[in-house]
Amino acid sequence: MDLEQKYQTGLHALKEYASTAGFTDVVIGLSGGIDSSLTAVMCVEAFGADHVHGFMLPGPYSTDHSLKDARDLADNLGIETQVISILEPYEGFERALHKVMGGDLEGLACENTQARCRMVCLMALSNRFNWMLVNTGNKSEAMMGFSTLYGDTAGAYAPLGGFYKTDIFALSRWCNERAEEEGAIPPIPHHVLIKPPSAELSPGAEDEKSLGVDYATLDKILIAHYDQGKTAEEVAALGFDLEQVQSIIVRADSYAYKRAMEPPFPQNPFYV
């Protein structure tokens, strides 16, 4: 599929799913990152700006530039936005767990608790106002288990769930180019397109550093093995390090249980 076809696939599936489920409005967490930005663009086209409710949920490691990127995106799209800090609930969990944890939350416990605090807030809004929570995850992260169960894996539908991270970048650029051709403001801020992706759950964190591989390489390996059925040796013959290929395959296979908890997406419509 070309970029327009990929975009339309996600768009139409999102509209159909929400309609079947009885939702007219959606809620989305706006992190200032490229995944939530592209998802927001798709939601506005699917439901109209008045029916898309965006929330920024800064935590202890959120950066000012990401909040600005999220605000700029919302302004470009004309959607309602509000800020809900997760510091208070996060610190509440930290206090409650301090004794049994033997101190403050650290490592994955610290990072994942932040993600789950965000999702508790978004789900509360979904329940209170009958808004469908739209998931912003992508296939690269799902394959590598680079997500938080009951955190950023939550949501009723994931319009980008079948697209790799490199697809997300390409689709985001395509959306901006389309807007320019139509004489409109490019919806996704330029800074979102060029900054290193980060979940901002720890100081200075960047996705590619955490994964140990850049997205361009990762996606090529995942596509060759899982989509095209090539063996690890055949993938390595394409110009990749065999040890790296094997490591990625082992990790992806080991996180199948996480993928089973991901919401439905256009390429995996188990709800039909």
Name every feature range the model reports, one short phrase each.
Residues M1-S31, S36-V272:
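ATP/NTP-dependent adenylation/nucleotidyl-transfer catalytic domains that generate, transfer
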